[in-house]
A protein has these predicted regions:
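Conserved alpha-helix/loop element of class I SAM-dependent methyltransferases that forms part
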Residues: 198-213
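S-adenosyl-L-methionine-dependent methyltransferase catalytic module, highlighting the catalytic core
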Residues: 60-62, 97-113, 117-198, 259, ...
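Core dinuclear metal-dependent hydrolase active-site scaffold
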Residues: 4-8, 206-208, 218-220, 235, ...
C-alpha cells in the first residue's frame, strides 16, 4: 500500500489519497467524476492542472472541487502499523509546526514497513528567500509564507535540504537521494528509507554480471534476484509466485543430484542465506559446483548470529571467515549454542528491533539500532566468491 498524504488537487493512481475534510473535498467513492477529472500518475504529477504557472498562482489556487480516498492527516494516518510500502507528501510539511512534524514522522515510522520509502517535497526556503531579495516579487513572498487563504494556508516551518534531513534522520530514517524538482519554483523532494533487513543483493558488491550470462538463484525466499534466469528451492510455496510470473522454477533439494540442471549450465550462481540451514553443506557444495561455473555464497557471520535470537532462526551452522580470505569459510555445527554479546543488553534480542506490537523495545532505541543494522548489514555477513568449484570446510 502507498499513501499520498495531503493529496489536495492531485489524485494519484496506485496510491491511497489522503486529505483533511473540507467543504469542497469529497471522497472518491461518492464522486467518481472528480476522480476522472483529477487522476494522474506519479511521473505526471501535475498533468491535470492549468493553474501551475507563476502568473496564475499569484492569485492563489483555483477554487475547485477535489477528491481523496479517505479523510485524514499526519496526526493519525489511516493505516495499520507496518502496512505501508511508501508515503509521498508534497508541500505539506511546511504547513506543520516543528512539533507537529516530529509527531508526523512518528506516524510515518509506525505505519511504514521495514525498507519502506518516505518522500517529502517542500519549498526551498533558502533559494526562495534569495529570489525575493533579488526581485522583490510578491510571488516569492507567497512561496515563503504560504497562500494564507485560511488557517491551513500558512507556512509554519521553513526548510533547507540540511534541516529537513536533520529532522527526518532524527527519527531513524536513512537518506537515499534527492529527486528531480517537479515545480517551476525552488523546491526539493528528499527520499528516505525506514531501515530494516535488506535483500543482500542491495548491499553486496557484486562484480558485473555480463549480459547473456545465465544466472541461477538458489533459495530465493523473500528476495528473488531480479537478474536470475532460474530459481531453485525445495519449497514449492516459494516458487509458485515466480512460476506464475513466467519464471523458470526448479523444485529440488540442492543437497541432492538436481537432475533438472545440466553440468555447468549456469554462468553465475547466487546463493544467499541458505547454506546455514542445510544438514549437509558439503553435498550442496558438490551439486552447486557441478551445475555452476562461478558464483557467490552469502551467509550470516557468527557475530551477526550473536546479535539475534539464534534459536529462532533454524540455522544449523555457524560460519566463520577463513583467515585466508581466498579460502572457503568454515562451517561449525551450532548444536543450538551461540556465543552472545552479553554486555549490550538491548542487543540480546535484535529481532525485536524489527518487530511491531507491544513487545517491541523503546521507539528511540528501536530507531537507532534499526538504522545501525541497516547501515552496517554488509559487515555482518560472510561473502564468498568462488570460481569453477565451491569449497566449504566443515568442523563437527
Amino acid at each position: 500500500m502507498k499513501l499520498h498524504v495531503g493529496s489536495g488537487s492531485v489524485y494519484l493512481e496506485g496510491y491511497r489519497n489522503i486529505d483533511v475534510p473540507a467543504p469542497k473535498v469529497f471522497l472518491s467513492e461518492r464522486r467518481p467524476d472528480l476522480v476522472e477529472r483529477w487522476k494522474t500518475t506519479d511521473d505526471q504529477y501535475y498533468a491535470k492542472h492549468e493553474d501551475k504557472t507563476q502568473d496564475k498562482l499569484r492569485k492563489g489556487p483555483l477554487d475547485q472541487e477535489y477528491v481523496c480516498d479517505v479523510y485524514g492527516d499526519f496526526s493519525n494516518l489511516p493505516a495499520p502499523a507496518w502496512s505501508v510500502d511508501e508515503i509521498l507528501s508534497r508541500h505539506v510539511f511546511e504547513h506543520l509546526s516543528f512539533a507537529e512534524a516530529h509527531k508526523a514522522l512518528d506516524q510515518c515510522d509506525e505505519v511504514l514497513k521495514e525498507n519502506g520509502i518516505l518522500r517529502i517535497d517542500v519549498p526551498d526556503s533558502k533559494a526562495t528567500l534569495e529570489l525575493y531579495r533579488q526581485t522583490g516579487d510578491a510571488f516569492y513572498e507567497r512561496a515563503l509564507l504560504g497562500p494564507r487563504r485560511d488557517d491551513r494556508g500558512y507556512h509554519l516551518s521553513p526548510y533547507t535540504r540540511e534541516s529537513l534531513r536533520a529532522i527526518v534522520e532524527e527519527h531513524g530514517f536513512v537518506f537515499v537521494a534527492e529527486e528531480p524538482n517537479i515545480h517551476f519554483y525552488p523546491a526539493f523532494c528528499l527520499r528516505f528509507v525506514k531501515p530494516g533487513h535488506r535483500a543482500p543483493r542491495d548491499y553486496v558488491q557484486l562484480p558485473a554480471i555480463p549480459a547473456g550470462w545465465k544466472v541461477l538463484d538458489i533459495g530465493p525466499g523473500e528476495y528473488p534476484h531480479p537478474r536470475a534466469d532460474a530459481y531453485l528451492d525445495y519449497d514449492i510455496t516459494k516458487l509458485t509466485p515466480l512460476s506464475e510470473r513466467g519464471k523458470r522454477t526448479i523444485r529440488a533439494d540442492i543437497m541432492g543430484d538436481v537432475p533438472q540442471c545440466e553440468n555447468k549450465e549456469f554462468d553465475f550462481v547466487w546463493m544467499s542465506h541458505c547454506m546455514e540451514h542445510l544438514k549437509d553443506p558439503l553435498a550442496a557444495a558438490r551439486t552447486i559446483s557441478r551445475i555452476g561455473k562461478r558464483g557467490v555464497m552469502i551467509v550470516p557471520s557468527a557475530w551477526k548470529e550473536g546479535l539475534t535470537n539464534f534459536e529462532e532462526t533454524g540455522h544449523l551452522w555457524q560460519i566463520l571467515p577463513n583467515p585466508d580470505e581466498k579460502a572457503a569459510p568454515i562451517f561449525v555445527r551450532a548444536n543450538g549454542q551461540v556465543d552472545r554479546i552479553r554486555n549490550i543488553d538491548v542487543m540480546k534480542s535484535m529481532s525485536r528491533v524489527f518487530r511491531s506490537g507491544p513487545n517491541r523495545i523503546a521507539p528511540s532505541e528501536q530507531r537507532s539500532l534499526r538504522r545501525w543494522w541497516y547501515e552496517n548489514e554488509k559487515e555482518l555477513d560472510v561473502v564468498y566468491f568462488w570460481e569453477n568449484r565451491l569449497d566449504v570446510r566443515v568442523m563437527e
